[in-house]
């Protein structure tokens, strides 16, 4: 949450590699849409798209809605596709393997839809098929059913609360994790950030967790707990 709060207030030029990934994503999205089949694309205008999405879903026709839009407290969320009849969400990624962030994307989309009174029964991720070769019969995209994973995570996720957190004037209290090592806002969250235990070489999650459990965040404090200190060389 703390990283999201800072990112929401950061504006930097988009580097060339990310621009290329964006265009790559557009191409893969079109390939996926061709494989899904015909559907009704919502307007580019986000406000009009929100209105049309709800109207189209209310018709309960057996068709795919492309780029639907859901308004949550003034923030518009646009999933890649949703079936108006089966209430299936589809998320398209220009990648070959599953990542945790992709599950979260589906959770956000599901939460936005259900915030607007649209129940979601299943969640599907579409990835580039690594087995596809030009001219063969393998599909260009593969589908992964993530319904169970998305439903479980959705039990503790509230999109309205997340949006409210991003809008609050002060950042949420930071929680130290091993991933903080690569965060550009580390020094803004923690004093003496260079002395944090996350900088210990080859520190595994198994060794890291007991330190936090004993409120030890800085290397200068490690020697105060001899048993934990000894685990670093075990």
Name each model feature, range by range:
Residues 159, 166-167:
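Solvent-exposed beta-edge/loop recognition patches
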Residues 1-87, 206-222:
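Metal-dependent nuclease catalytic cores that hydrolyze phosphodiester bonds in DNA/RNA
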Residues 50-64, 70-161:
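Nucleic-acid nuclease catalytic cores
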Residues 18, 22, 95-103, 173:
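Short, charged/polar micro-motifs that form catalytic or ligand-binding hotspots
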Residues 133-148, 185-203:
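Short His/Asp/Glu-rich catalytic/ion-coordination signatures at enzyme active sites or charged loops
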Residues 1-3, 167-196:
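Cysteine-cluster motifs in flexible loop/terminal segments that predominantly coordinate metals
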Residues 112-116, 188, 214:
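Active-site catalytic microenvironments for nucleophilic, acid-base chemistry
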Residues 195-233:
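Helix-hairpin-helix
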């Amino acid at each position: 949450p703390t990283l999201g709060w800072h990112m929401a207030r950061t504006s930097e030029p988009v580097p060339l590699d990310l621009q290329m990934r964006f265009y790559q994503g557009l191409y893969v999205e079109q390939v996926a849409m061709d494989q899904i089949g015909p559907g009704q694309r919502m307007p580019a205008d986000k406000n009009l798209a929100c209105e049309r999405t709800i109207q189209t879903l209310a018709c309960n026709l057996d068709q795919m809605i492309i780029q639907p839009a859901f308004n949550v407290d003034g923030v518009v969320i646009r999933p890649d596709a949703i079936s108006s009849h089966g209430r299936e969400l589809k998320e398209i990624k220009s990648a070959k393997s599953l990542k945790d962030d992709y599950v979260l994307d589906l959770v956000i989309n599901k939460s936005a839809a259900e915030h607007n009174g649209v129940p979601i029964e299943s969640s599907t991720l579409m990835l580039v098929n690594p087995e596809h070769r030009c001219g063969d019969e393998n599909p260009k995209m593969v589908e992964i059913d993530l319904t169970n994973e998305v439903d479980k995570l959705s039990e503790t996720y509230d999109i309205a609360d997340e949006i409210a957190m991003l809008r609050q004037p002060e950042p949420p209290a930071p929680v130290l994790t091993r991933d903080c090592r690569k965060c550009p806002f580390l020094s803004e969250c923690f004093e003496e950030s260079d002395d944090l235990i996350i900088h210990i070489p080859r520190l595994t999650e198994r060794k890291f967790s007991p330190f936090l459990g004993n409120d030890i965040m800085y290397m200068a404090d490690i020697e105060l707990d001899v048993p934990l200190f000894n685990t670093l060389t075990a």
